[in-house]
């Protein structure tokens, strides 16, 4: 029994596919630090010679990106040699790579000229080896469009496997996506990122999924929603010291799962970087509306009890923010009566001060007055059904959202508040088994699952990292509570 490596099979297929016309092949010129667009029929090979001036060896990064293709087409193959292929084949003097998800990359150090071949022979329509050369098994417009690029050191097009686009939350017609931390805290300049969004498993999405590593595929194929349909802005919200770009997507359909891809075009040259896709599902009920960029409760970026027939998203955000700020302002008047600048002997705590108290109160207040809203048909055990009995009564009187389910505030917010503020203010938390479960939720250790609400809780944070932060705060607060409050 004989076993053949994929590399050997590619060589055999390449040898078979080009020997029929190798000696009469025409080589198209490709200059270093340039790109060229090409079209190739199924079962065909295209040839290029890469040249540059001088007798200098360069580290050449060669990329082949599939831009558009016919249904059923497999990925292309890329070959490079320092000999013409009629000379290279007998000497086995060439390098091969097969495209993966629409992108093939070869790094090679060499002198001018280098010889390149792009082949479509390795596809599901490849004829039997005993079929007459040049005979095709499929009729029709079997054309693949591609981009071939040759750069120095750094490839023109590349795929970055690090996840960099995250879904924060959705409502029944919108979604909020956010990038990871950028390299600056500058928020006045919006970077050049682009997004492409389609219903998962749709025709458009299947195309992007097949060529999910190819930059030109995103720019050459249609998309249901893209950067032109999104409200783009910058934010400092969330973890990390740097700015992030956020995309507010409108006009989505209820109860639909979407896949979004983030790409970053190069500045000053063709090509760009593609990042992994992210999926999200819009809510079913219009009782939840997505709000973000609040002035006071600035970490709020999630769906809240709403009513789109009475409030736009921006008006709803302003109403909630004003409610929270009004309570906070009154609280500061009371806190001003506390001798915050007292000596350590007369201070209310050796561990906490009035700034800690104010910050803990703000975090607790924003999560309590601005509930996180979930679909009425979501049967998750950590959700609480609300029907004209919202934790903040004015929600039912003014917003009138109708029935919805709430993600309760995290219990550690209450413990932090009680342990950070003077006892004279009277903050107390319900005990487990005596009302805590009906007022507060607990942090989950499942990645991406938000089982309780707190400022800054994000879908993209790993459950373990969030759990560590939350339980550290919880532990310190609980010890204080046991020693000094109960």
Curated annotation (Swiss-Prot):
<feature type="transmembrane region" description="Helical">
    <location>
        <begin position="465"/>
        <end position="485"/>
    </location>
</feature>
<keyword id="KW-0325">Glycoprotein</keyword>
<feature type="topological domain" description="Extracellular">
    <location>
        <begin position="25"/>
        <end position="464"/>
    </location>
</feature>
<keyword id="KW-0812">Transmembrane</keyword>
<feature type="topological domain" description="Cytoplasmic">
    <location>
        <position position="486"/>
    </location>
</feature>
<dbReference type="Pfam" id="PF12929">
    <property type="entry name" value="Mid1"/>
</dbReference>
<feature type="signal peptide">
    <location>
        <begin position="1"/>
        <end position="24"/>
    </location>
</feature>
<keyword id="KW-1133">Transmembrane helix</keyword>
<keyword id="KW-0107">Calcium channel</keyword>
<dbReference type="GO" id="GO:0005262">
    <property type="term" value="F:calcium channel activity"/>
</dbReference>
<dbReference type="GO" id="GO:0098703">
    <property type="term" value="P:calcium ion import across plasma membrane"/>
</dbReference>
<dbReference type="GO" id="GO:0005886">
    <property type="term" value="C:plasma membrane"/>
</dbReference>
<keyword id="KW-0407">Ion channel</keyword>
<comment type="function">
    <text>Calcium-permeable, cation-selective stretch-activated channel (SAC) that functions together with CCH1 to mediate calcium entry into cells. Required during mating.</text>
</comment>
<keyword id="KW-0106">Calcium</keyword>
<feature type="glycosylation site" description="N-linked (GlcNAc...) asparagine">
    <location>
        <position position="49"/>
    </location>
</feature>
<keyword id="KW-0813">Transport</keyword>
<feature type="glycosylation site" description="N-linked (GlcNAc...) asparagine">
    <location>
        <position position="59"/>
    </location>
</feature>
<keyword id="KW-0472">Membrane</keyword>
<dbReference type="InterPro" id="IPR024338">
    <property type="entry name" value="MID1/Yam8"/>
</dbReference>
<keyword id="KW-0406">Ion transport</keyword>
<protein>
    <recommendedName>
        <fullName>Stretch-activated cation channel yam8</fullName>
    </recommendedName>
</protein>
<dbReference type="GO" id="GO:0016020">
    <property type="term" value="C:membrane"/>
</dbReference>
<feature type="glycosylation site" description="N-linked (GlcNAc...) asparagine">
    <location>
        <position position="82"/>
    </location>
</feature>
<keyword id="KW-0732">Signal</keyword>
<keyword id="KW-1003">Cell membrane</keyword>
<feature type="glycosylation site" description="N-linked (GlcNAc...) asparagine">
    <location>
        <position position="33"/>
    </location>
</feature>
<keyword id="KW-0109">Calcium transport</keyword>
<feature type="glycosylation site" description="N-linked (GlcNAc...) asparagine">
    <location>
        <position position="93"/>
    </location>
</feature>
């Amino acid at each position: 029994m004989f076993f053949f490596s994929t590399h050997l099979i590619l060589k055999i297929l390449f040898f078979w596919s080009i020997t029929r016309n190798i000696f009469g092949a025409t080589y198209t010129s490709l200059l270093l630090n340039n790109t060229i667009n090409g079209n190739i029929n199924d079962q065909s090979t295209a040839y290029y010679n890469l040249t540059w001036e001088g007798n200098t060896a360069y580290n050449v990064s060669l990329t082949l990106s599939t831009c558009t293709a016919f249904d059923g087409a497999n990925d292309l193959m890329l070959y490079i040699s320092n000999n013409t292929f009629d000379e290279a084949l007998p000497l086995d003097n060439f390098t091969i790579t097969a495209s993966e998800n629409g992108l093939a990359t070869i790094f090679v150090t060499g002198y001018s000229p280098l010889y390149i071949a792009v082949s479509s022979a390795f596809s599901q329509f490849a004829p039997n080896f005993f079929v007459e050369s040049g005979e095709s098994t499929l009729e029709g417009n079997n054309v693949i469009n591609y981009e071939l690029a040759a750069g120095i050191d750094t490839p023109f097009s590349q795929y970055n496997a690090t996840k960099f686009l995250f879904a924060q939350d959705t409502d029944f017609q919108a979604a909020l996506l956010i990038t990871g931390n950028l390299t600056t805290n500058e928020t006045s300049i919006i970077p050049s990122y682009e997004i492409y969004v389609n219903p998962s498993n749709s025709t458009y999405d299947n195309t992007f999924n097949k060529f999910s590593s190819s930059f030109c595929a995103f720019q050459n194929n249609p998309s249901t929603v893209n950067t032109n349909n999104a409200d783009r802005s910058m934010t400092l919200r969330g973890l990390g010291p740097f700015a992030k770009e956020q995309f507010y997507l409108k006009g989505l359909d209820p109860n639909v799962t979407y896949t979004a891809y983030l790409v970053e075009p190069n500045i000053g040259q063709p090509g760009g970087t593609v990042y992994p896709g992210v999926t999200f599902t819009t809510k079913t009920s219009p009782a939840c509306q997505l709000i973000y960029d609040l002035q006071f409760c600035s970490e709020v970026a999630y769906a809240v009890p709403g009513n789109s027939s009475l409030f736009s998203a921006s008006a709803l955000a302003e109403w909630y923010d004003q409610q929270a700020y009004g309570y906070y302002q009154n609280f500061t008047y009371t806190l001003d009566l506390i001798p915050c600048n007292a000596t350590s002997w007369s201070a209310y705590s050796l561990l906490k001060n009035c700034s800690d108290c104010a910050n803990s109160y703000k975090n607790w207040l924003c999560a309590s007055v601005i509930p996180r809203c979930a679909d009425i048909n979501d049967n998750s055990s950590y959700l609480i059904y609300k029907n004209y009995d919202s934790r903040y009564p004015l929600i039912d009187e003014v917003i009138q959202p109708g029935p919805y389910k709430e993600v309760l505030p995290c219990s550690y917010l209450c413990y932090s508040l009680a342990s950070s503020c003077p006892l004279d203010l009277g903050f107390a938390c319900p005990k487990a088994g005596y009302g805590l479960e009906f007022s507060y939720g607990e942090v989950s250790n499942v990645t991406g699952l938000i089982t309780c609400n707190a400022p800054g809780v994000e879908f993209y944070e790993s459950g373990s990292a969030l759990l560590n932060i939350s339980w550290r705060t919880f532990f310190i607060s609980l010890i204080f509570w046991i020693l000094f409050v109960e």
